[in-house]
């Protein structure tokens, strides 16, 4: 009787131990899978932030060129006697270019929808990522407002020379030449901070 009870208890303990080991191993596998998914999601975030960074840098260069173009036209005398046709075409093209910017947040939205955000396990990193995307939104809004205001000032210019020699055109040029560059004024360093934090986490 003692042997059968002992054997029964041994079997029960073996089953319990087997179940416990199975759950422990499954838990480790699940955690490892979540860590892999988090790393993959963060790599997408990093790539998207780097792309946004590049777009902001490109727009910053364009707006610097726009200001230089306005200064060029303001430097000409009333008769434009010193203007070269090539320069007029180049700078006029810059000022009248159809520009806009749209910074992406698809990777962030995917991370939020996948419920992996809380699995990052690093509140400081999560906040840096959110702050970087908030900064992207602010920069894009500032840049697009700037471009809309510029377009409103310039209107539908048919003849560059006639417009920029007019009082209205000179006023528009002065405003453009004095405006700060929103892409350089805004704190785009937030994106680099988040990218570096992701690199450290990975």
Q: How does the language model describe each region?
A:
Residues 19-40:
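Transmembrane signal-anchor/signal-peptide helices with a preference for the extracytoplasmic
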Residues 46-202:
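Interfacial alpha-helical end/capping and short helix-turn segments at domain and membrane boundaries
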């Amino acid at each position: 009787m003692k042997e059968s009870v002992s054997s029964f208890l041994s079997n029960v303990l073996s089953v319990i131990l087997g179940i416990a080991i199975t759950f422990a191993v499954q838990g480790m596998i699940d955690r490892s899978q979540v860590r892999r998914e988090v790393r993959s999601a963060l790599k997408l975030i990093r790539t998207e932030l780097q792309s946004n960074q590049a777009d902001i840098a490109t727009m910053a260069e364009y707006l610097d060129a726009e200001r230089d173009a306005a200064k060029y036209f303001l430097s000409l005398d009333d008769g434009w006697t010193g203007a070269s046709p090539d320069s007029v075409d180049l700078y006029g093209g810059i000022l009248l270019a159809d520009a806009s910017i749209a910074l992406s947040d698809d990777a962030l939205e995917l991370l939020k929808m996948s419920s992996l955000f809380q699995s990052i396990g690093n509140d400081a990193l999560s906040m840096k990522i959110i702050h970087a995307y908030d900064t992207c939104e602010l920069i894009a809004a500032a840049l697009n407002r700037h471009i809309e205001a510029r377009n409103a000032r310039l209107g539908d210019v048919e003849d560059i020379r006639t417009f920029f020699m007019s009082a209205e055109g000179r006023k528009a040029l002065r405003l453009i030449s004095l405006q700060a560059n929103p892409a350089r004024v805004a704190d785009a360093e937030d994106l680099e901070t988040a990218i570096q934090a992701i690199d450290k986490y990975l």
